Amino acid sequence: MLRLPPLAVLLLLTLGACQAPDPLVKPSPTNSPELKSQLTLTNATLEQANAQGQPLWKIQVQSAQYTPDRKQARLKTIRGDLYQDGKVVLKVKADRGEIRDNGAEILLSQNIVALDPRNQAVLYSQEVVWRPQAGILTARQNFRGEHPELVVTATEGRYETGPQFLHLTGQVQADAAEKKLRLTSEALRWEIPNHLLIGAQPLKLVRYSGAEITDQIEAPQARVHLKNRQVFLPNPNQFKSLQPPLQITAQNLTWFYDEKERRLETFSPLTILDYQEEITITGNQGRVDFAQNQVWLTGSTQALSAKNQSRLFADVLMWNIPDRTLDASGNILYE
């Protein structure tokens, strides 16, 4: 075993045609071409540790070609582990790579796969940079992330290995719940342990039943709880359902997108428009149950039919969507 400071390189290798200088030969005052030559290792295991002796990374390579100062190296056929606090946080493989700045940065390129064994998230890209001291893996080309709860693509992905948060930027697309829900935006944060997807920039949500779109919404912000299959929309939003044909406007909407519990709930004023029958109903709070095809509204409710110019006021309204019938109770007034 041979260690090459400062990279703390454990060599399990067969030296190629180029051999290291005779250790008994002292360097001359002049810059010797022999001493300045590159070191090439084959079938080597390389590792780096922090000041406390904890591993930062450990990789096996087909070949490693070092610069004369031994602070940089070009790598081929890489497979290994990336660490944080002495524990493996990513298992990686790639076709090419580089050790930079005395091991403070690892660049991987071409056919990269990175698996987090703690949560089973798999990250794919054509170029990533690992900064062990920061615990951040940045993917810059053709990024894709896969997990049992979610599949994402983006121009760039930045993975914080400590909290296990994935930050996505540029043409982001996220498919959840076996492609029942698709979210698109320019930026998202995926908190993997919390089963949470956060969009702080304008985004679009589309719900599918098979290949057919059932619901869609454009919103300035959203929080998607992947485990519970619900979306919280905190700002004024306009929700459009194609099955049934409803348009719902409200603030602070909670949307349950599971097939068996598909519904909307809000404790703020809302307006519901049946855009085929031209019926509008409003209330101070309400619930739309798509699975049961029913709507409940309470608090200063009213229903307006544009076709027959009629209006109904009540404390409580229940609307049966398929046959367009209304049940009213409390302070009823019909015009």
Segments from the language model and where they lie:
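Mature-chain termini and adjacent capping regions
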Residues: 1-335
